[in-house]
Regions:
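Catalytic cores of secreted/periplasmic lytic hydrolases that degrade extracellular macromolecules
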Residues: 1-156
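Beta-loop motif signature
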Residues: 157-178
Length: 178
């Protein structure tokens, strides 16, 4: 939820689509893991994580090396009790994962440019694919996912009230309370 996490809805949806094959991948179907979240990530603890800490799903996966070559490995992925837990854990990870003393995805929360947001995710080490940024941007553009991004509030969320120290009678208080 963009309003809760500050992560663009278009970016989260594009990752969901890419990482889970529109929710139809083996990992999404058998483990409710729609974002390719491995069991071992950044120390495994961050505020709001939604994984139970021990349920895993092992499967072969492809990793791309920096030279562009591919290698097949067997990896343990997080297994969730629901897709909702997968979505919540993904957001919590992007907001709270650390790389030493720095946030791994610093600047992602509140970023309003999807191209910059997906670059932050790639630069933080989320995926090994050299084409990850281009693939996410293509999905966002192909499906016009930016239409789901919440508009940034342009009006203050607090209201100011003029308060009198002394009220002569109840009638003079009319309109002072909501």
């Amino acid at each position: 939820n963009q309003r809760q996490s500050g992560i663009l809805a278009s970016v989260s949806m594009a990752q969901f689509i890419l990482e889970s094959g529109y929710g139809k991948s083996e990992l999404a179907q058998d483990a409710n893991n729609c974002f390719g979240m491995k069991a071992s990530l950044s120390g495994n603890t961050w505020s709001g994580f939604a994984w139970d800490g021990h349920s895993v799903y092992s499967m072969k996966t492809g990793e791309q090396n920096t030279d562009g070559s591919y290698v097949s490995i067997t990896a343990d992925f997080r297994k969730y009790s629901s897709i909702e837990d997968s979505i919540n854990d993904h957001s919590a990870y992007l907001l709270g994962a650390m790389n030493g003393s720095q946030k791994r995805y610093e600047g992602l929360a509140g970023c309003t440019d999807y191209k910059k947001a997906v670059q932050i995710i790639k630069d933080g080490g989320y995926a090994t694919s050299l084409d990850y940024v281009q693939n996410l941007c293509r999905i966002i553009e192909q499906w016009n996912l930016t239409q789901y991004d919440a508009a940034v509030a342009t009006t203050p969320t607090t209201a100011l009230y003029r308060v009198r120290k002394n009220w002569p009678d109840a009638a003079s208080q009319k309109g002072a309370f909501r």
